[in-house]
């Protein structure tokens, strides 16, 4: 049958050719976490099936986006919702919504024409981070504050938004006070909670707390498509965010296209995630960490402990330390050997580094194993390889 005559249902039937193998791409075991550079999470089988089914039929994109948003808003207990091209896209589109609201302007006016416009976004100095480039795409100017008095005094006619980085461990102003002061000045509050599920209830905790907009990554804890995300919040702001997004032409979000497969996949992932239990997930992750630790218990001088970060990636991680005078290999060298091995294994990037990663404590003497993105049985593969590398250097 020729390609032009083959129905879509036939084209996607079966597993098909393995293009990773065809392209010579190395498959890995992900003992790191939901990092973008490692293709984030694995979609569960029901989500994969929903994506494949969505690929079989064309639809009207805005009808799909609208109905998906309405469905998600009901499930996630908020006024309105939309599927975005990841959390960074949600940050840009939410900021664009606040900019166009404050300036009573059209999407095509941003960000090329900000001269004389209202474009100030308040943020705690301790909440500045690499990802705030997604906000700066809209032509905003950050105004940094540290104390509640600074914050109160920073509002003026040019203030369009107050931004909060949910996972930040520093900063003097908590969520409730951040919201209260902004709302006193009739300014919307945006919370970047990209990596902050589980727990499942965080999907509605922050909007119910009073944040006007909240961004989540779709391809992390929710286990949706890697290039999908969620923007939740006030109906008027979600409407403006939608107007600033693809498929509309002259707007800041034109390059942030979300395909039908990603929209359906994100909805399916939310359905799947809401069917899970926080307790069951945490118990399974704890078991994986315990199994790895038990397999390493007789490595000389080795000590292990399990740490759960306080906000982002709030799941058990295994931290391993040992005397490098007895086990003569550094954590960074262990990570390199596991990466080069077969199968190739990636450890958490906090391994062997003085700075922690996403709330995980670490130093040059610590191996960090993320267990929550492991597939069944992979925990013991990681355990065996760690043991091989460590014991071969004693």
Segments predicted by a language model, with ranges:
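Conserved PLP-enzyme active-site core in the AAT-like
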Residues: 11-38, 42, 69-81, 88-274, ...
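Generic structural marker for isolated residues within well-ordered, non-membrane alpha-helices
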Residues: 48, 69, 293
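Flexible, glycine/charged-enriched surface loops at secondary-structure junctions
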Residues: 61-66, 80-81, 253-257, 276-285, ...
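A glycine-rich beta-turn/hairpin centered on an aromatic-Pro dipeptide
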Residues: 289-294, 319
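Conserved C-terminal alpha-helix-loop-beta "cap" of PLP-dependent enzymes
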Residues: 297-389
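C-terminal alpha-helix/helix-terminus motif
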Residues: 4, 386-394
């Amino acid at each position: 049958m020729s390609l032009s005559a083959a129905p879509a249902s036939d084209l996607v039937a079966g597993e098909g050719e393995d293009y990773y193998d065809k392209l010579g791409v190395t498959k890995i075991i992900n003992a790191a976490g939901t990092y973008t550079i490692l293709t984030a999470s694995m979609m569960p089988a029901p989500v994969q099936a929903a994506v494949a089914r969505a690929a079989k039929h064309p639809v009207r994109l805005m009808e799909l986006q609208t109905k998906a948003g309405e469905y998600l808003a009901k499930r996630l207990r908020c006024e309105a919702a939309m599927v975005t091209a990841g959390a960074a896209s949600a940050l840009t589109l939410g900021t664009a919504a606040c900019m166009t609201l404050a300036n009573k302007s059209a999407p095509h006016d941003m960000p090329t024409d900000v001269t004389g416009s209202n474009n100030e976004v308040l943020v705690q100095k301790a909440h500045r981070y690499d990802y705030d480039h997604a906000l700066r795409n809209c032509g905003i100017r950050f105004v940094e504050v540290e104390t509640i008095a600074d914050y109160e005094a920073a509002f003026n006619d040019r203030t369009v938004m107050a931004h909060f980085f949910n996972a930040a461990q520093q900063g003097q102003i908590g969520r409730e006070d951040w919201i209260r002061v902004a709302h006193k000045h009739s300014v919307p509050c945006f919370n970047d909670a990209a990596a902050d599920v589980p727990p499942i209830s965080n999907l509605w905790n922050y909007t119910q707390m009073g944040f006007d907009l909240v961004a989540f990554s779709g391809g992390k804890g929710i286990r949706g498509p890697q290039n999908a995300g969620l923007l939740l919040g006030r109906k008027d702001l979600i409407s403006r965010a939608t107007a600033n997004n693809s498929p509309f032409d002259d707007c800041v979000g034109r390059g942030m296209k979300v395909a039908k497969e990603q929209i359906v996949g994100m909805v399916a992932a939310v359905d799947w995630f809401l069917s899970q239990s926080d307790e069951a997930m945490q118990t399974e992750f704890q078991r994986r960490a315990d199994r790895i630790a038990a397999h390493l218990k007789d490595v000389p001088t080795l000590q292990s402990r399990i740490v759960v970060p306080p906000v982002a990636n709030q799941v058990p991680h295994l931290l391993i330390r040992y005397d490098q005078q007895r086990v003569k290999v550094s954590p960074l060298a262990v990570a390199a050997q596991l990466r080069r091995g077969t199968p190739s294994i990636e450890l958490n990037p906090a391994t062997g580094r003085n700075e922690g990663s996403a709330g995980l404590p670490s130093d040059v003497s610590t191996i960090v194993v993320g267990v929550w993105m492991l597939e069944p049985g992979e925990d013991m593969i990681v355990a065996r390889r760690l043991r091989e590398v460590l014991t071969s250097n004693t």
